[in-house]
Amino acid sequence: MKRIYIILFIILGIHFSFAQEETKVDENFPFSLLVRYFNYLNHGKEELKTYPVLNQPESYCIWGCIFLMESEDETIKKIAIARLKGIATQLFREGKPVLLTSGMNSANFNITKNVNLEDDNNIIYVSIADCIVTQAQDKAQGIFNHQTRKLIEENK
C-alpha cells in the first residue's frame, strides 16, 4: 500500500509540474518529446487493475516512464522498460530518432547538436538531467538509447 501511495505521489507531482510549464513545452521542441503522451501503447494493459497508476496519462511519456523506473516493484519497472522501448520505436518510425543525454552540461551539448538535425541520422538529443542522475534515470536512459541505436543500425 505504501508503494502505491509513493507512486501516486510521483505521478501527481509530474502532472502538476508539467501543467505549470505548458507554454514553455511548446517553445522547446526537444523537451516537448519528454512529456509527449503515447497513450496508445498497450504495454502493461493486463496490470492496469492491480496498478491503477499505470493507466495515468503521465505514465505514457518518457518522463513518466523514468519516474516509474524509481519504483521498487519489479512489475512496474518491466512495464516502464517496455513503454520506453515502445516510445523509442514510435519516435524512430516518425523520423525523429531520440537519444537521451545526462550529466554535466548535457543541455548545452544538446542545443549545439540539435542546431543541425541532419548531421547524424537526424538524431534529436534530449537531456533528462544535468549534474545529478539517479540509478533509475541512468538505466532508463540506457534502455531508451539502446533501442534507438538498435533501430538506427537495423535501418542503415
Regions found by a protein language model. Name each.
Residues 1-25:
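Bacterial Sec-dependent N-terminal signal peptides
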Residues 22-156:
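Short beta-strand and adjacent turn/loop elements
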